[in-house]
From Swiss-Prot:
InterPro entries: KsgA/Erm (IPR001737), rRNA_Ade_diMease-like_C (IPR023165), rRNA_Ade_Mease_Trfase_CS (IPR020596), rRNA_Ade_methylase_Trfase_N (IPR020598), rRNA_adenine_dimethylase (IPR011530), SAM-dependent_MTases_sf (IPR029063)
Any one GO CC term of the record: cytosol
Gene: rsmA
Catalyzed chemical reaction(s): adenosine(1518)/adenosine(1519) in 16S rRNA + 4 S-adenosyl-L-methionine = N(6)-dimethyladenosine(1518)/N(6)-dimethyladenosine(1519) in 16S rRNA + 4 S-adenosyl-L-homocysteine + 4 H(+)
Major localisation: cytoplasm
Top-rank EC class of the record's enzyme: transferase
Family: Belongs to the class I-like SAM-binding methyltransferase superfamily. rRNA adenine N(6)-methyltransferase family. RsmA subfamily.
Binding site for S-adenosyl-L-methionine: N18, L20, G45, E66, D89, N110
Subcellular location, record wording: Cytoplasm
GO MF term list: 16S rRNA (adenine(1518)-N(6)/adenine(1519)-N(6))-dimethyltransferase activity; RNA binding
Record-listed E.C. numbers: 2.1.1.182
Name this polypeptide is given: Ribosomal RNA small subunit methyltransferase A
Annotated organism of origin: Cupriavidus metallidurans (strain ATCC 43123 / DSM 2839 / NBRC 102507 / CH34)
Role this protein plays: Specifically dimethylates two adjacent adenosines (A1518 and A1519) in the loop of a conserved hairpin near the 3'-end of 16S rRNA in the 30S particle. May play a critical role in biogenesis of 30S subunits.
UniProt keywords, alphabetically: Cytoplasm, Methyltransferase, RNA-binding, rRNA processing, S-adenosyl-L-methionine, Transferase
Amino acid sequence: MRSNVHQGHVARKRFGQNFLVDDGIIHGIVSAIDPQPNDIVVEIGPGLGALTDPLLERLPGMQVVELDRDLVERLRRRYGDRLVVHAGDALAFDFGKLREPGRALRIVGNLPYNISSPLLFHLVDFADDVRDQHFMLQKEVVERMVADPGSKSYGRLSIMLQVRYHMEHVLDVPPASFNPPPKVDSAVVRMIPWPRAEDGTLRSPYAACDAGVLGDVVTAAFSQRRKVLRNTLSFLRDQVDFDALGFDLTRRAEEVPVAEYVELARIVGGAEPPARVA
């Protein structure tokens, strides 16, 4: 029987609350995280503690960010000094302030599906502070995050996150693993920020570019997915010599690799185009 009441708490739709109850899935997630005693582990949206409990079996303490005031008080009573509870909205939270020298900052959570994309983009601002992130998300979102060019799932989210993270689709989670069950399948993703070299540049497969410019270019490219780029990127003709760059405008947006979008954003942002090999 479906119910929105679990452990005496009524799941609140406006907070996107679906509580994880499958012990096998919980074990799989904690094993994937593999928390170490010196880690600073921060959980977003701990809910009723389905992940918090097994994480604290391996950690002396951890921190959580929770918006639901009823759950905030419940968590504080239950865990006491072992759990630092930050009451507030993760979309406005400064995760960088939790960083400590010599300790890995790691962020985990079963993210509310109704704010997952904005929250992922908010966390990009703290990628330099974080060792890794493990999140439960709608399966469709995870597939978009890790998608390759040419697939239906490939889009703005794929490009903007792949530029900053190495990502892995870790495991799938069926609706029956939650109470109340969501109407969609879920999945767990691992996100590891590309590290920086001593000079501050990212050690990633992609050249450095302005994230704002890249976002504008990619948003324009995908604004009309069924049309070729000659239509959606025509406004850049005064800034970019597409022929000299070797950028084929007869393609659709989903056919263009991340590296080509990055190079296009670099040129729009003022970088010199690369020399073409004859």
